[in-house]
């Protein structure tokens, strides 16, 4: 029998995941929303132990709405009656949206406090910082925005502890110091520095550029850029231009990818930056590495779709050709 409204691949995967978790009798499961929240297939849980909302930006605007308030309303769909939601405190512009939803549902609203992130030390191995009463937390993820994410994690763990889960400070510190997230301000190499980052919208690019300026002050960056045609390409280019020494253009492996030649032409029209279009990701990675000086910083970004191939090509290129230079 053929269903009139067939489930999507993501819905089938969600159902498979639920079955697997039930069979394994998991004590605690973390479900990540695919897109939005209110209508997402993961949102079948009646009242989770905690709902978590990180920073909100303008992305998937066709599906979720064209303002931060509309997107926040969709994200807020995971807030359930009598539940608890932890929200990144940097979402000040849309916090009233979450407050209104919590008033309506009787949910408890907990916010992180980014302003209480202090005594920050940045290094290639990660970040050290204080948060509220916790001193010298070691975070293995690089990118200054990751400390905001860590603050949300800390508040979430405290909520779970109040619900009876035994976690403890030692486990918290261990988790922060060992967490690994490929493709998020990930350093694949030093001398030259090669970074790969999955930022794919203006807010993501802003966060990436803030981290680049923090880690590499007064330094121009050689970008390897591939973006989907559905994204706000012009705004992303405007943001990147002041920091760019050079832009190499690639096409992400997606039918929605912006054509590399067309994008290179757009960059030439809109930006005063040397630009090269590459026929493949492999060619782009190889060229950027072969033409780099040891002190250069290469940053591959623009799409999550490109990350796996970029990482594979870069690691292979450095392994074959880099001799005595420093690998991570």
What does each of the following model-derived ranges do?
Residues 303:
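Active-site-proximal loop/hinge segments that shape catalytic or ion-binding/gating pockets
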Residues 91-110, 124-125, 193-194, 202, ...:
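C-terminal helical cap/extension that packs against the catalytic core
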Residues 24, 28-31, 39-52, 56-61, ...:
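Nucleotide phosphate-binding/pyrophosphate-handling subdomain across enzymes
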Residues 1-46:
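ATP-dependent carboxylate-amine ligase catalytic core
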Residues 88-89, 101-123, 140-144, 171-178, ...:
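Beta-strand->loop->alpha-helix junctions that form or flank phosphate-binding loops
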Residues 121-135:
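Acidic-glycine-rich active-site phosphate/pyrophosphate-binding loop
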Residues 253-254, 319-328:
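Short, flexible loop segments at boundaries between secondary-structure elements
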Residues 37-39, 44-106, 233-234:
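Conserved catalytic-core segment of NTP-binding enzymes
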